[in-house]
Amino acid sequence: MVINMKWEENVRKVVPYVAGEQPNRPNMIKLNTNECPYPPAPGVRKAAENMESAALRLYPNSNAQPLVDELAAYYGVKPEQVFVGVGSDDVLSMAFLTFFNSGKPILFPDVTYSFYDVWADLYRIPYHTCALDENWHMNPEDYKQHNGGVIFPNPNAPTGVEESQELIEEILQANPDVVVIVDEAYV
């Protein structure tokens, strides 16, 4: 007996994420999968050596409160102004669910981080992609149309092009009533 769950229809519409080619060479550093080309800093090594290994078998604090408190103190904000997740994709997922639910299309570049359309499809968020120019830059005029939010990486993935502060400010000023996310995962 086959039971169709309500959520199946939504999930079946999502095109699976396909990772780019992953060469299997021992000395290759894959920046596209966030591998770091540098060894851990001496302070990190020392902290790891001094870490109580028994704690590694336990789940961390479920709301990461110690980390949230430290980040809030460091940046001079209240802890309730800090959000952490289990990776950037988790944070992006929560951002899409939280901020992009007006029914209006969100905007992002046509050549960009490949998970934006996956999240939009999964959460049934309409979207419109905006073409980059011949030098792989965003055209701020494209982001002045009626929308339900804007998201773009800076620098862009996969082009590596970094937009100017002036362009970002122009997009922010043109969108005072929606959330604009400048995804700086690759800074």
Model-derived regions, located:
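Conserved core of the PLP fold type I
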Residues: 56-177, 181, 186-187
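N-terminal "arm"/small-domain region of PLP-dependent enzymes with the aminotransferase-like
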Residues: 2-58, 146
